[in-house]
Curated annotation (Swiss-Prot):
Biological classification of the source: Bacteria, Bacillati, Actinomycetota, Actinomycetes, Kitasatosporales
Family listed: Belongs to the universal ribosomal protein uL2 family.
Entries under Gene3D superfamilies matching the protein: 2.30.30.30, Nucleic acid-binding proteins, Ribosomal protein L2, domain 3
Domain of life: Bacteria
Descriptive protein name: Large ribosomal subunit protein uL2
InterPro entries: NA-bd_OB-fold (IPR012340), Rib_uL2_dom2 (IPR014722), Ribosomal_uL2 (IPR002171), Ribosomal_uL2_bac/org-type (IPR005880), Ribosomal_uL2_C (IPR022669), Ribosomal_uL2_CS (IPR022671), Ribosomal_uL2_dom3 (IPR014726), Ribosomal_uL2_RNA-bd_dom (IPR022666)
Record region (Disordered): 26-57, 225-278
Ranges that cross the membrane: none
Keyword Transit peptide: no
């Protein structure tokens, strides 16, 4: 993937850039793997906003991605197409299995049209192949990793994401996450070799607010510029938060929200580096 920069023909175009899509080989998705997707606009079943800054955007169709590839062990597949997916930052690859079935997977870096992909313990260690962690050599770069055996891929699924297999100890594997966190995962969990493609996605300059609106992202307004009726930080002459610590629009203290008693904390060997907020 490369990035194409626009000429500054308008203020919105100045500095903006877009992916060149050279790796995409087909513009229309596989009909049997497409489902309707209804935009929620950040609302729940009661119609109340539960996630702010969402709404609008272009209509999308959901592509069904295979995050559980257990049932295709020993069945080889050929990469028919690399496609664009509007619902994620990564590209997706359409696989044609030898038994006639078609499925989508996340497209790893350097996976090309016509390549062969395999699943199971007998698969080679090359990008796109899916194996259990116990069958992957230490030091290998992997992505789309399960948290629990058979639970489907949960980690490292966005563009450019990758995890390194550091060690194996007993029944657990030590993984270095994209955040720098080192975590224990059961060796029976599956992972895909390689890193997710489209790594240049993070370098795209959107250029104007309208391009974010096309993606369904609404403006983020700071509480300090609101009125007192709208936010605890609102009001006052000039920029002032009233001398209180940062809070949400509902008055709840801002900061870290993870519970110190969470059961899965015992699987974290080393935490990611963060700028701690008091």
């Amino acid at each position: 993937m490369g990035i194409r920069k626009y000429k500054p023909t308008t203020p919105g175009r100045r500095g903006s850039s877009v992916a060149d899509f050279v790796e995409v080989t087909r513009s229309t998705p596989e009909k049997s793997l497409v489902r309707p997707l209804h935009s929620k606009g950040g609302r729940n079943n009661a119609g109340r906003v539960t996630v702010r800054h969402q709404g609008g955007g272009h209509k999308r169709a959901y592509r069904v991605i295979d995050f559980r590839r257990h049932d295709k062990d020993g069945v080889p597949a050929k990469v028919a197409h690399i496609e664009y997916d509007p619902n994620r930052t990564a590209r997706i690859a359409l696989l044609h299995y030898a038994d006639g079935e078609k499925r989508y997977i996340l497209a790893p870096r350097n996976l090309q049209q016509g390549d062969r992909v395999e699943n199971g313990p007998g698969a080679d260690i090359k990008p796109g192949n899916n194996l259990a962690l116990r069958n992957i050599p230490v030091g290998t770069t992997i992505h789309a990793i399960e948290l629990r055996p058979g639970g489907g891929a949960k980690f490292a699924r966005s563009a450019g994401a990758s995890v390194q297999l550091l060690a194996k100890e007993g029944t657990m594997a030590h993984l270095r996450m994209p955040s720098g966190e080192i975590r224990l995962v059961d060796q029976r969990c599956r992972a895909t070799v390689g890193e997710v493609g489209n790594a240049e996605q993070s370098n795209i300059n959107w250029g104007k607010a309208g391009r974010k609106r096309w993606l369904g992202v609404r403006p983020t307004v700071r509480g300090v510029v609101m009125n007192p009726v709208d936010h605890p930080h609102g009001g006052g002459e000039g920029r002032t938060s009233g001398g209180r610590h940062p809070v949400s629009p509902w008055g709840k203290k801002e900061g870290r929200t993870r519970s110190p008693k969470k059961a899965s904390n015992k699987y974290i060997v080393r935490r990611r580096k963060t700028n701690k907020k008091r």
